Regions:
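A short beta-loop-alpha structural element at the N-terminal edge
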Residues: 3-18
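Conserved GNAT-fold acetyl-CoA-binding loop/helix
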Residues: 24-44
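A short helix-loop-beta-strand connector motif used in the catalytic cores of GNAT acetyltransferases and
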Residues: 45-57
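Conserved beta-strand in the GNAT
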Residues: 57, 63-72
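A short, internal acetyl-CoA/4′-phosphopantetheine-binding micro-motif in the GNAT/acyltransferase core
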Residues: 57, 86-95, 124-125
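Conserved acetyl-CoA-binding loop-helix of GNAT-fold acetyltransferases
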Residues: 89, 95-109, 133-137
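Conserved GNAT acetyl-CoA-binding A-motif
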Residues: 110-124
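Conserved catalytic-core motifs of GNAT/GCN5-like acyltransferases
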Residues: 121-124, 136-156
Length: 174
């Protein structure tokens, strides 16, 4: 399999929408429901990531099969972080190392090009130990849970854990 990883572009929007909708109904997947994957949502995070963060796509055989993004909030006190990190891999390509490769490339770009970024943040469901271990293997630290923050249905909630990665070359110039 030949995986190409490049920066996201506005022209990728429709393919990214389809990718997100394709995986939105996977149990323990992304937090958004299928009907919340809108043009406005994807356009919004692509704009934010392009202007104040980073978004990458993974392409196999001219098809976008993965996407990762995070961005800096438009708040002075948070200028050192990327947050709302989301990563998706097409269900037909999961388990093939694509998620790890695109995530590692993302972190490499932060270390080499975005050295003003000290911290990257994400949430994952506490009970999804596979994801927790995956993020820990990339260097993320579990900063604790937020009890019952995720609404599932009346009287059914889930606890996400907040995880952070710290840039080992923060503010170092070559």
């Amino acid at each position: 399999m030949n995986l190409q990883i490049i920066r996201s572009e506005p022209g990728h929007k429709d393919e990214i929408i389809n990718l997100y909708r394709n995986i939105a109904d996977i149990s323990d997947g992304i937090i958004r429901c299928r009907d919340e994957i809108t043009d406005e949502y994807v356009s919004g995070f692509l704009k934010n990531a392009t202007e104040r963060g980073l978004s990458l796509v993974g392409i196999v055989n001219n098809k976008i099969v993965a996407e990762i993004h995070a961005y800096t909030p438009n708040i002075f006190a948070f200028q050192h972080l990327l947050t709302d990190l989301t990563i998706v891999v097409d269900r037909d390509y999961q388990g093939q190392g694509i998620g790890r490769k695109i995530f590692e490339r993302f972190l490499d770009i932060v270390k080499t090009e975005l050295t003003h970024i000290y911290r990257i943040e994400l949430y994952t469901r506490e009970h999804n130990l596979r994801n927790v271990r995956f993020y820990e293997s990339l260097g993320f630290v579990n900063e604790g849970g937020q009890k019952d923050k995720i609404y599932v249905s009346p009287m059914v909630f889930e606890t996400p854990v907040h995880m952070a990665w710290f840039n080992p070359i923060y503010m170092k110039k070559e």
